[in-house]
Amino acid sequence: MYRPTTTSYSPVYTGNPLYDISASQSDPRQRIRKNVRFQTEVDEFPDFDDSDSDELQFENRDPRKRIDPIKHMLLVQRLKRVSTSSRRLFIFTLSMFLIAFILLIAFVSFRD
C-alpha cells in the first residue's frame, strides 16, 4: 500500500486522525475529539453500565430521547385537570353516601 511521505501532506493534516484538524466541518478527515458527548461511543457492559458514568445505572444520553418540555407541560396540565375532576367526583360520591347513611339511621331510629 502506497503511503505518501509527511512532506506531501498539507500542513493541516499530520496523518494521525487524533490530531488532524479539519479545514471544514464537512471534511471526512475531521478531527476526532475525545470525551465529547454524542461523538464518541460509550463503552457498554452487559448489564448496561458504562465505564465513564458516575451513576450506577446506564443513562441514555441520546438527546432525541429527551422529553419535549411543551408536551410535558401539556401532559401535566391534563393530569391536573383529570385529578381535579376525579377529586370532585369522589367528594360528591362520598357526600351522597354520607347523606344516604344519615337518612337510613334517621329512618331506622324514627321507626322505633
Swiss-Prot record:
Disulfide bonds: none annotated. Its main location: Golgi. Keywords: Endoplasmic reticulum, Golgi apparatus, Membrane, Phosphoprotein, Transmembrane, Transmembrane helix. GO terms for cellular component: cytoplasm; endoplasmic reticulum; endoplasmic reticulum membrane; Golgi apparatus; Golgi membrane. The keyword Heme does not apply. The modification Phosphoserine is found at residues 51, 53. It is found in: Golgi apparatus membrane; Endoplasmic reticulum membrane. It is a single-pass membrane protein. The chain crosses the membrane at residues 90-110. This is Uncharacterized protein C1795.12c. It comes from Schizosaccharomyces pombe (strain 972 / ATCC 24843).
